[in-house]
């Protein structure tokens, strides 16, 4: 079902609020239109994953997340991944592979997040991370622990890590060492 009418209800340099009329006489459905962005699983030459710690005004605290940023007009997700990696961490990658994209929130957002894996990442001489960003490195077990304990908890970036794992780009343990606990039977809501 396509909207009968779509109007920009509010606009900023970073996003637009859209009002979509779905049926005559009904109140509009509101959603956000944002640019796509790329998140980078950057693996250093010594097999550590880069992360950044930065203050996020939306949640009013520092967060730990993957290097990421908007895909600029005319830029590919791989180019955005390389640029953001360099800007946020001061690292350059030997290779960047785009694994695909996901829709961050199909009920509210009209954009995509691109999963990129950068390998052979090394610090570029003379480059420093953006002001206010602390660069962190994790081994895969350390990153798994940080995720399990809620230290690394950007939901979309956890999803990006999962995509990298299921595509075989990150291996936490040999496949035969991973076990899945039996699930409890589903409970019916009454």
Q: Where on the chain are the PLM-derived regions?
A:
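Acidic, metal-coordinating catalytic segment for phosphate/diphosphate chemistry
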Residues: 4-41, 45
């Amino acid at each position: 079902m396509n909207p009968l009418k779509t109007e920009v209800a509010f606009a900023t340099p970073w996003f637009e609020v859209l009002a979509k009329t779905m049926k005559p006489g009904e109140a509009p459905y509101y959603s956000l239109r944002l640019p796509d962005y790329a998140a980078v699983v950057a693996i250093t030459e010594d097999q550590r994953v880069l992360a950044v710690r930065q203050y996020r005004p939306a949640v009013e605290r520092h967060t730990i997340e993957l290097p990421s940023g908007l895909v600029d007009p005319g830029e590919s997700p791989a180019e955005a991944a390389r640029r953001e990696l360099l800007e946020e961490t001061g690292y350059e990658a030997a290779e960047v592979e785009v694994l695909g994209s996901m829709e961050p929130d199909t009920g509210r957002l009209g954009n995509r997040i691109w999963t990129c894996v950068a390998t052979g990442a090394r610090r570029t001489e003379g480059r420093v991370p953006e002001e206010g960003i602390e660069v962190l490195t994790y081994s895969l077990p350390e990153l798994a622990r940080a995720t399990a304990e809620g230290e690394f908890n950007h939901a979309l970036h956890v999803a990006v890590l999962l995509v990298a794992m299921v595509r075989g780009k990150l291996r936490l343990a040999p496949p035969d060492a991973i076990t899945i606990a039996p699930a409890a039977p589903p409970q019916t809501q009454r």
